[in-house]
Amino acid sequence: MFKIDYALDGPVPWKSEECSRAGTVHVGGTLAEIAAAELAVWRGEPPEKPFVLVAQQSLFDSTRAPAGKHTLWTYCHVPNGSSFDMTERLESQIERFAPDFRDRILARHVSTPVELERYNTNYVGGDINGGVQDLWQLYTRPTIRLVPYSTPARGIYFCSSSTPPGGGVHGMCGYFAAQAALRDL
C-alpha cells in the first residue's frame, strides 16, 4: 500500500455532489480501469491509474482540522515492498474526479510500503491486511482456534485486519472480538 495523509485548505472539490457527503470514496474510474490497476499490481508493476481509497473524516468530525480546513488520507495498492513514488499518479487520479484538488493541498505526508512496515512490523511489505487472507490463515492466527479472537491466555482477545472478516470491513473485527469476550464472561 502507498499512503498519503493531507492537510487541505477546504473540502475536496468533487464533481459528484454525493462524493462531497461521503466519509469514504473509492476512486477507480471504469471497471476496465480498476481491473487494469489491480492486474498491474499483481504483475509487480505500479498502476498508471490506481484504484484509490479516499477517507475524508473531517467532513463529519470537526476536531480533525482547524475551522475551514480539512484532513484527508488516501491509499492505493502497489506491489509488495514497492519503492515507487505514486504521489503524482494518485493525485492525478483524484483530480480526474475532483478538478483542482491539488490547489487545496496545504501539506502532505507520504508513506511508502517500506515506511508502513517500519511503522508497524505487521504490515510486511506495506500490506495493511497482515498478510495472506485465505480461509486457513484467518482461523490459524495466532494459534489454531475455533474462535480466532481468543488467545491461549484466558481473558485476552485480539482483533485486527488479520482476524475475520479481514481488512476493509472496518470495525467488524473489533465487534466480533467483543462478542467473543462477552460470551466468555
What are the language-model segments listed below?
Residues 159-183:
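A conserved FAD-binding loop/helix module that cradles the flavin
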Residues 10, 98, 181-185:
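A generic secondary-structure signal for well-formed alpha-helical elements
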